[in-house]
Amino acid sequence: MKFKQILLPLIAVLVGCSFYSFKGSIPAHIKSVHVSPITNNTIESSTSDVIKYELEQSFINENVLKLLSLEDSDSRLDLTVISFVDKPYSYNIDDISTTGYEVVDRYRIDVKVKVKWHDLKNDLLLFDQEFLGWASYDPQNDIGSDGIDNDNDSFIDDKDDDEFGLPRESAIKIASKQITESIINNIISTW
C-alpha cells in the first residue's frame, strides 16, 4: 500500500514532465513564422541585416517555430529598426594632462526595434512591442581582448563566445542578439 502511495505521484510527475515544451504557450494552431523584410528607419544600414540573420538563427536553433514563406506560414513578424544610437559611454580622464581634454574610452550602441507579430490564420495582432538591445565597445582595441564586458553578461573577452571581431560591428551583433532573444522570449510567453 505504501509503495502505491509513492509510485502513483511519481508516475504523475514523470508523465507531466514528458510533455514539457519550449514552445511555452504559443497558440496551438501557430506552428510557423515568416520574418518580413526589415524596415530600417536609421542611417545604419547593416543593422537590419544583422537582426534578420540573428532572428532567423534563433528560430532555427531554438526550434520554437518553423521559418516558412509568407504563403505557407501561420504567423508573420514585421520589424522596424526605429532607433540606432552610437554615443560615448565612458571617458578616460588620465589623458587630460597629455591632450588637454577627456578622451572617449568606450562607446555604447543602442538599437531599438518595433515588432509586430501577426496571427495569419485568425487575422489577429498577437503583439506590438518595442525591444532594445545595447553593447559597449572600445574603438581602439579588439573586442575580444579589450578587458570589457561588452554585453553585460558577466563574461569578458576569451570567456565570452560573442566577443570577437571588429569592435563596432561586434557591438551591433551583440545588441541585435539581445533583441532577438527578447523577441523569442516574448513569442514564447505571449499567451
Go through the PLM ranges and name each one.
Residues 6, 24, 68, 102-104:
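Residues embedded in well-ordered secondary-structure elements
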Residues 22-24, 28, 86, 150, ...:
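Generic structural "secondary-structure junction" signal
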Residues 1-16:
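Sec-dependent bacterial lipoprotein signal peptides
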Residues 3-5, 36-37, 44-51, 78-86:
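A generic short-segment signal for beta-strand/edge and adjacent turn/coil regions
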Residues 16-73, 91, 121, 168, ...:
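A structural "domain/chain start" motif
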Residues 78-145, 165-166:
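Surface-exposed short loop/turn segments
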Residues 118-128, 132-191:
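C-terminal/domain-edge helix-coil "capping" segments
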